Swiss-Prot record:
It holds the Pfam family F-box. Residues 1-48 form the F-box domain. InterPro entries: F-box-assoc_dom_typ1, F-box-assoc_interact_dom, F-box-like_dom_sf, F-box_dom, SCF_F-box_component. This is Putative F-box protein At3g16210. Coiled coil: none annotated. It comes from Arabidopsis thaliana. It comes from the Eukaryota.
Length: 360
């Protein structure tokens, strides 16, 4: 590295800096720039970076440490655009520590809350608030991509935005799909995006889109999917997983997809594992589920009570729990601020790879 600072020592120092500081250190010399851009350094930096949760509620973004001390202090993030560009309908996706946010003018914004960099993705031409969206990395072409399916008449067309070219392209057309989706937000794993889709209660499946080949296929859901009220896709232990909530049984089930395409159930929890007897005056439902870097489970519940003697603001209650898979124990995550408007939660880790590909 230099006669004054060995490369090993420089790496030990640089991996402890923030992304904002690293952006400045890139300008010190060509050697440091090449080191910071090196894939090996990028992986080391990601592995050593602490994980934080990013949440979206009350039309603002916050950084949380769900696994740290309680009560959790919410640190408001500086949104880079005018606050009027987002509202309750805003859709948020994430990949490699970077968020993809829908804006009210039908454009998208890719934003890294760690480096504070952002980029506007133009409207693909025809956009609806119901279009499914995905954001992920294509390792074959070393490029990040945004995917949306646009339905017109009897055809669903996949449009892909490539950051390498800075433009949208039409990739494939599916005739007469008549598909509906559990959640418009796609789940990213390896080089694939996944959505839960259905035509009817008897025809349910997972839509899988390959970011490298721009091809799609249909994957089966778990065979015991009947009776499920809500379901969410996620990633745990580098495997695609599905969390299912069966309201009649008040049961949460989590299964992972094996390489063979079959499903293996890994967790089954009853509502009583989280909600105390005193709190059961509320009718709690699972609102959404997230996984931590340690493969623990973060479950958010919304409870309803229509008792006429209660004030309107008291009839709805939100609770969040951290379920630790190692010792099979759950603990309530308490916040300094109320959770009434919480709509999105994902774990983000600072990583240089996406910054090096999108923002430079």
């Amino acid at each position: 590295m230099s006669k004054f600072l060995p490369e090993e020592l420089a790496i030990e120092i640089l991996v402890r800096l923030s992304m904002k500081d690293l952006a400045r250190f890139r300008c010190v010399c060509k050697t440091w720039r090449d080191l910071i851009n090196d894939p090996g350094f990028t992986e080391t930096y990601r592995d050593m970076s602490p994980a934080k949760f990013v949440s979206f509620y009350d039309k603002n973004f916050y950084m949380l440490d769900v696994e740290g001390k309680h009560p959790v202090i919410t640190n408001k993030l500086d949104f880079p655009l005018d606050q009027s560009m987002i509202d309750e309908s805003t859709c948020v996706l994430h990949c490699d520590g970077t968020l993809c946010v829908t804006l009210k003018n039908h454009t998208l914004m890719v934003w890294n809350p760690f480096s504070k960099q952002f980029k506007i993705v133009p409207n693909p031409g025809i956009y609806q608030d119901s279009n499914i969206l995905g954001f992920g990395y294509d390792p074959v072409h070393d490029d990040y991509k945004v995917v949306t399916f646009i339905d017109r008449l009897d055809v669903s067309t996949a449009h892909v935005f490539e950051f390498r070219t800075g433009s949208w392209g039409e990739s494939l057309r599916i005739s007469y799909p008549d598909w509906h989706y559990r959640d418009r937000r796609g789940t990213f794993l390896d080089q694939y995006l996944y959505w839960i889709a259905y035509r009817s209660s008897a025809d349910r499946f997972i839509l899988c889109f390959n970011l490298s080949t721009h091809e799609y296929r249909k994957l089966p859901l778990p065979v015991y999917n009947q009776g499920v009220t809500s379901s969410w896709l996620g990633v745990t232990s580098q495997k695609l997983c599905i969390t299912e909530y069966e309201m009649c049984k008040k049961e949460i089930r989590i299964s992972v997809m094996e390489k063979t395409g079959s499903w293996s159930k890994i967790i089954s929890l009853s509502m009583s594992s989280f909600i105390s007897v005193q709190d059961r005056i509320y009718d709690y439902q699972v609102e959404f589920v997230s996984f931590t870097r340690k493969n623990d489970l973060v479950v958010t519940f919304t409870g309803y009570n229509d008792h006429f003697e209660m004030e309107p603001e008291e009839r709805t209650k939100k609770k969040m729990f951290l379920y630790k898979t190692g010792n099979e124990r759950s603990e309530e995550v308490r916040f300094c601020n109320p959770l009434a408007g919480l709509r999105f939660l994902c774990e983000c880790v600072e990583t240089l790879k996406i910054v090096n590909r999108i923002f430079i």
